[in-house]
Each structure stands twice: as structure tokens, then as C-alpha cells.
A protein has these predicted regions:
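Glycine-rich beta-strand-turn "strand-cap" elements at beta-sheet edges
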Residues: 4-12, 58-71, 98-122
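Short, well-ordered beta-strand segments in beta-rich or mixed alpha/beta enzyme
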Residues: 20-27, 60-92
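Residues that cap or initiate secondary-structure elements
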Residues: 30-32, 83, 118-119
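Short amphipathic alpha-helical segments
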Residues: 32-59, 95-99
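An amphipathic, aromatic/His-enriched active-site/gating alpha helix that lines ligand/cofactor pockets
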Residues: 49-55, 78-113
Length: 122
């Protein structure tokens, strides 16, 4: 294998070893679902695409048999390291949360979960 390929693989392995993940769950009440889904499509996706420190992300609609009074959505953000995640939380997440609160008030609740991979197979 060429030396540059070996170096590239080593860099990828190092990145995944140090990666840091943030799971943001948005709970929307059933009365605001249509407006929230429009906001996701028109605003949240664009904001996420423009995040410089986010390596990869997954935006999902969460299915649950236990939630009847609304719906959950999840934004899984993958950072190269803990510091980038912490910087995001201190600035961008605060900004996103304030925008959502201003537009939706208590109708959309935000829950953050810090995921610290022990092992991954990405």
C-alpha cells in the first residue's frame, strides 16, 4: 500500500477515535407540528448545513410508541473532538435554542445528550 494511503487511514482512525457526538432532541407539541416541520425543512437544515465545526450530522424523525402528545425529532452532530463540541454548545447551540424559543416558546422543548464514544465502527 502506498505511504500516503497508510497516512490517510491513520488520520481517519485518529479522527474517529477522538470524535465527540452531541444528540439534540426536539419535542414538539402536536398543536404545532406542521409549523415545526416547516421550520425544520426551511431553517434548521440550513443552519445545520452551515455549521463549520460539525463533521457529520443526521437529522431524524423519532418514532416512539410512548409519545402521544407530540413528536420528537433528533439532530445527531459529530465533531472531530470534545473542544469543538464544547465550543458549539457555548455559542451555536445557544443561538439555535434562543431562535427556537423565540419562535415556538414552550411548544418545542430541547434536550441535549452528550455521547462520548467508547467504541465505534463508522
Amino acid at each position: 500500500m502506498p505511504i500516503f494511503a497508510v497516512e490517510f487511514i491513520q488520520k481517519i482512525l485518529k479522527i474517529h477515535k477522538n470524535m465527540s457526538v452531541l444528540s439534540i432532541t426536539f419535542h414538539c407539541t402536536k398543536d404545532n407540528l406542521e409549523e415545526w416541520e416547516n421550520y425544520i425543512d426551511e431553517t434548521l437544515v440550513l443552519m445545520t448545513e452551515n455549521l463549520m465545526d460539525v463533521d457529520k450530522y443526521i437529522l431524524s424523525e423519532v418514532h416512539s410508541d410512548f409519545i402521544e402528545e407530540g413528536k420528537n425529532y433528533n439532530l445527531l452532530l459529530i465533531f472531530d473532538n470534545d473542544q469543538l463540541r464544547e465550543d458549539f454548545i457555548q455559542s451555536e447551540l445557544l443561538n439555535i435554542s434562543e431562535r427556537i424559543e423565540k419562535k415556538f416558546g414552550q411548544e418545542v422543548m430541547i434536550f441535549n445528550t452528550f455521547l462520548n464514544p467508547k467504541k465505534s465502527r463508522l
